[in-house]
Amino acid sequence: MDKFRVQGPTRLAGEVTISGAKNAALPILFAALLAEEPVEIQNVPKLRDIDTTMKLLGQLGARVERNGSVHVDASDVNVFCAPYDLVKTMRASIWALGPLVARFGQGQVSLPGGCAIGARPVDLHIYGLEQLGAQIVLEEGYVKATVDGRLKGAHIVMDKVSVGATVTIMSAATLAEGTTIIENAAREPEIVDTANFLNTLGAKISGAGSDKITIEGVARLGGGVYRVVPDRIETGTFLVAAAVSRGQIICRNTRPDTLDAVLAKLREAGADIEVGEDWISLDMHGKRPKAVTFRTSPHPGFPTDMQAQFSLLNLVAEGTGVITETIFENRFMHVPELIRMGAQAEIESNTVICHGVDKLSGAQVMATDLRASASLVLAGCIAEGVTTVDRIYHIDRGYDRIEDKLRALGANIERVKEHE
């Protein structure tokens, strides 16, 4: 297993080009199964989860290749089962189920893996597909869905906001007979991006980005070319990198309008921020950040995927900040690792109280999930001495060449292969 060795402290400064959003590229790749003609998807990040998805689509019989863009031709899909050996590393595989049952009348997906943060049941996906008329059984570790003829449009009220289930229902409903309405739908930018992709292929989806999405079913979807939205979480991570190191940064190829809650908290922390249509600049003018208090909540609230990075910000800030995590359980696993580097914090159930310290010290730490691993790498950049971050396969699942981008900002970071 690779690890990162980081020598600090450094003040990070410079420019970074943001990659396409993993959380939009994944549902879009799975939604390409609905298309009867070839699709070209641009701005797809180079990540382990993307590679796994491309491999999975290939196993289902789609022709998939990458040459700059990702090209998917699902016209000859003839296998309707996503096997355990690919699904076990990535919970996003459940997104194959809706398109398979909607287009082919059958699909089965092994129960998924992914980050070890709390319970992420597939119940809401199953509930949604059942409302559309699919018969679903769970057996031998697989979710198996079938339907006679086409799925039927339905009025579906979600009892919990779920990005994953909203994507499943919206994708499947594009080929259903009649109209589907999803109430209490997730509002994330990645939902909007997936809807825009499907509409490019001929779907009739309106209301994405609000809590009520309407899908008028169509008989078939064709091909098209689509560009994935920039990654707001990668953008936020690099903005925090500059903030915690008292540095400055310009993020290019990004979408400031998807980051309102994060930018507001960075301004509160003392950052000088300017935005253009596709760029954000942040300058700390050499100052230490101020602690901030917030609760994570579904979009447009503060994103849970930025919570670990802001925990780090609070732990090196002036003052005390309180962070309450309302989305996932077990999402403070980075905090004990940061305490080993000299941070001061108490965890009380779903809240962490962060007491800012003036400096951290390098230590050997272990990544436990994707965003936690990013906060540990950033901690290494600002800590005095050497930090090694183990289990960085987590970070490769969600960040496109993070060490190259940090190095361009002045970080002293190297990837150490296991045999060295």
Curated annotation (Swiss-Prot):
GO terms for molecular function: UDP-N-acetylglucosamine 1-carboxyvinyltransferase activity. Its EC number is 2.5.1.7. It is an enzyme of class 2 (transferase). Its main location: cytoplasm. Belongs to the EPSP synthase family. MurA subfamily. It is found in: Cytoplasm. GO terms for biological process: cell division; cell wall organization; peptidoglycan biosynthetic process; regulation of cell shape; UDP-N-acetylgalactosamine biosynthetic process. GO terms for cellular component: cytoplasm. This is UDP-N-acetylglucosamine 1-carboxyvinyltransferase. It comes from Pectobacterium atrosepticum (strain SCRI 1043 / ATCC BAA-672). The modification 2-(S-cysteinyl)pyruvic acid O-phosphothioketal is found at residue 115. Pathway: Cell wall biogenesis; peptidoglycan biosynthesis. The active site is at residue 115.
